[in-house]
């Protein structure tokens, strides 16, 4: 049960935090509609798990996370979010917000499940990212980090 909870939580955290590998900003969606690809290294922080349903992973349980986002070995922001479990396998609905220094925010959502590869939708943003739309992937590295790639329109 603990291993299932840990794998599920790491998956959620990695997915949400699902979001990033060391790399560079090739481009970023800005208010003028330009798009591009952003790559981050995500450093997962301990998450909080609230067991609201049946004991152990079950529908209605909640995971909240707050993770660090790095590029080229430098912290460039963080992400916060939550996931609501829909069943005992760890399948969950997740939403989050990335804060990128003084540039603005990017919002995202994804379906979390145990596999280490997650696909997410970029649903909006603020500041330089106020017209952000697109998608991305989060790939868990198995060491408390992940690679996040966002493709913004």
Where do the model's predicted regions map?
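Secretory targeting and sorting signals
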Residues: 1-28
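Beta-strand-enriched cores of mature, soluble protein domains
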Residues: 27-153
């Amino acid at each position: 049960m603990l291993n299932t909870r840990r794998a599920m939580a790491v998956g959620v955290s990695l997915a949400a935090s699902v979001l990033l590998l060391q790399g560079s900003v090739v481009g970023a969606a800005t208010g003028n509609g330009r798009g591009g690809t952003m790559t981050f290294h995500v450093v997962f922080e301990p998450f909080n798990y609230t067991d609201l349903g049946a004991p152990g992973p079950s529908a209605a349980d909640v995971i909240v996370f707050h993770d660090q986002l790095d590029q080229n070995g430098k912290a460039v922001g963080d992400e916060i979010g939550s996931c609501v479990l829909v069943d005992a396998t760890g399948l969950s609905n997740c939403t989050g917000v990335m804060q990128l220094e003084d540039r603005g925010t990017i919002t995202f959502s994804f379906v979390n499940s145990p596999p280490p590869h997650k696909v997410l939708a970029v649903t909006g943003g603020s500041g330089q990212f106020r017209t952000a739309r697109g998608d991305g992937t989060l790939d868990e590295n198995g060491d408390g980090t992940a690679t996040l790639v966002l493709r913004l329109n």
